[in-house]
């Protein structure tokens, strides 16, 4: 398939004034004549005006090589539009091209290795036939068979010549089909530009819109059926619009939205605009949802999805010394919180080490310091094979020790 780059570079296209707006050019004689008729007698002022006029004239006459869009519009403007009978003829050749390319793909389907595998299988089949028949064909038998089939050397040469003739005709039809497809596409590139202009300022540059629209035009040329009686431009318009709108949906946003959601957002905007004109005020969410036959919850979800992302580095305030990210609460732990938690764990271990081993183990199990699960007095008693009351006494004694200023002074810093 011809790529969009080929569409933009292979064309050799009179300038279509409907597609671009060029300022009217003036030559030096017009400028000088205008200046002579000026009643200003100040020579210095006249000299400055003359120099300014010449600079403007030079700017107007800059080569278009600095503006690729204008060059492209000039080139495609030189391509003549097709007549109805020409469209039909080109469409027939393109349909023939598609059939030939399918045939060509079928013949080129196997690689050399795969063809070798096919030959190997044929030889295996031949060997099995020989084994089953329990005898090998003799040379005399082969000669007799060839004599019956009348495969003479002149006949084989005639077949070879015919195959070369057919291959040459096949290549010619492929070439003419591809040229017909090129001509059909190039003759309708102005249609792509006219449609692309309607989708400007939607997230893609004008060049990208033309590129995507050209791909849609190529697809239209391949799918066009002239027997249905439609003009090609009418048929191609849908394909061009579809290619452009899908590209906008896929590429224009930082966070990609599904195409169907993008289309719904476009319908919401259009409905809002229509209701605003009818009511002469901004419509409410309920009015928009009722008009579009959807729930308010779905409307709000789609509207929220349509919001554009904003950078966390966006300056805030008159002095612009703060950033948006400074005012957003983080869901996870900050580095400071993580460091503080690690220090608390270390200090808590040091304090627990001042207790007896049994007191330390009871507090660990009671408050879930190891696995995060707090155990009951009865569960801990079963672990140590003592009564529930004995565990309560051990816990109370350990807590009294921890309340001593020599032990809890370090831990109090974390709760201030």
From Swiss-Prot:
The protein's matches in PROSITE patterns, at most eight in alphabetical order, are given as: SIGMA70_1 (PS00715), SIGMA70_2 (PS00716)
* Sigma-70 factor domain-3: region residues: 263-338
Sigma-70 factor domain-2: annotated span? 184-254
Give the UniProt subcellular location, in the record's own words: Cytoplasm
Single Gene Ontology BP annotation: DNA-templated transcription initiation
Location, primary (coarse class): cytoplasm
Q: Where is this motif: Interaction with polymerase core subunit RpoC?
A: 208-211
Q: Which UniProt keywords apply?
A: Cytoplasm, DNA-binding, Sigma factor, Transcription, Transcription regulation
Q: Which residues bind DNA?
A: 377-396
User: Which InterPro entries does the UniProt record give?
Assistant: RNA_pol_sigma-70_dom, RNA_pol_sigma70, RNA_pol_sigma70_r1_2, RNA_pol_sigma70_r2, RNA_pol_sigma70_r3, RNA_pol_sigma70_r4, RNA_pol_sigma_r2, RNA_pol_sigma_r3/r4-like
Entry's Gene Ontology molecular function annotations: DNA binding; sigma factor activity
The cross-references to Pfam families, in alphabetical order and at most eight, read:
Sigma70_r1_2 (PF00140), Sigma70_r2 (PF04542), Sigma70_r3 (PF04539), Sigma70_r4 (PF04545)
Q: Which GO terms describe its cellular component?
A: cytoplasm
The region called Sigma-70 factor domain-4 is annotated at 351-404
For this protein, the record's SUPFAM superfamilies field holds: Sigma2 domain of RNA polymerase sigma factors, Sigma3 and sigma4 domains of RNA polymerase sigma factors
Name the job this protein performs. Sigma factors are initiation factors that promote the attachment of RNA polymerase to specific initiation sites and are then released. This sigma factor is the primary sigma factor during exponential growth.
* Subunit: Interacts transiently with the RNA polymerase catalytic core.
Which HAMAP family does the UniProt record give? Answer: Sigma70_RpoD_SigA (MF_00963)
Question: What is this protein identified as?
Answer: RNA polymerase sigma factor SigA
């Amino acid at each position: 398939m011809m790529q969009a780059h080929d569409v933009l570079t292979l064309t050799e296209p009179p300038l279509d004034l409907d597609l671009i707006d060029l300022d009217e050019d003036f030559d030096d004689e017009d400028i000088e004549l205008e200046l002579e008729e000026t009643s200003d007698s100040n020579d210095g002022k006249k000299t400055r005006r003359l120099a300014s006029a010449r600079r403007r004239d030079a700017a107007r006459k800059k080569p278009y090589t600095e503006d690729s869009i204008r060059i492209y519009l000039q080139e495609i403007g030189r391509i003549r539009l097709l007549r109805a009978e020409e469209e039909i003829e080109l469409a027939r050749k393109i349909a023939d091209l598609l059939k030939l390319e399918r045939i060509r793909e079928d013949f080129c389907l196997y690689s050399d290795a795969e063809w070798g595998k096919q030959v190997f299988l044929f030889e295996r089949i031949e060997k099995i036939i020989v084994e089953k028949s329990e005898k090998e064909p003799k040379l005399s038998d082969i000669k007799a068979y060839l004599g019956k089939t009348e495969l003479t050397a002149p006949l084989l040469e005639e077949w070879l010549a015919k195959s070369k003739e057919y291959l040459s005709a096949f290549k010619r039809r492929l070439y003419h089909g591809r040229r017909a497809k090129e001509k059909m596409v190039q003759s309708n590139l102005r249609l792509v530009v006219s449609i692309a202009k309607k989708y400007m300022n939607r997230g893609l540059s004008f060049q990208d819109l033309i590129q995507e629209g050209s791909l849609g035009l190529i697809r239209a040329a391949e799918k066009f059926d002239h027997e249905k009686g439609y003009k090609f431009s009418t048929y191609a318009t849908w394909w061009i619009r579809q290619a452009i709108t899908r590209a906008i949906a896929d590429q224009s946003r930082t966070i990609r939205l599904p195409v169907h959601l993008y289309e719904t957002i476009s319908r919401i905007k259009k409905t809002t605009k229509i209701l605003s004109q009818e009511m002469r005020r901004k419509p409410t969410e309920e009015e928009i949802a009722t008009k579009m036959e959807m729930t308010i919850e779905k409307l709000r979800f789609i509207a929220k999805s349509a919001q554009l992302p904003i950078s966390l580095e966006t300056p805030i305030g008159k002095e612009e010394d703060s950033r948006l990210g400074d005012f957003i609460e983080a869901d996870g732990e900050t580095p400071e919180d993580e460091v503080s938690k690690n220090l608390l764990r270390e200090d808590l271990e040091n304090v627990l080490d001042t207790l007896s081993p049994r007191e330390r183990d009871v507090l660990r199990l009671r408050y879930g310091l190891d696995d995060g699960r707090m155990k009951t007095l009865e569960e801990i008693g079963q672990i140590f094979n003592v009564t529930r009351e004995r565990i309560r006494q051990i816990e109370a004694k350990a807590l009294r020790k921890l309340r001593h200023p020599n032990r809890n002074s370090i831990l109090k810093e974390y709760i201030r």
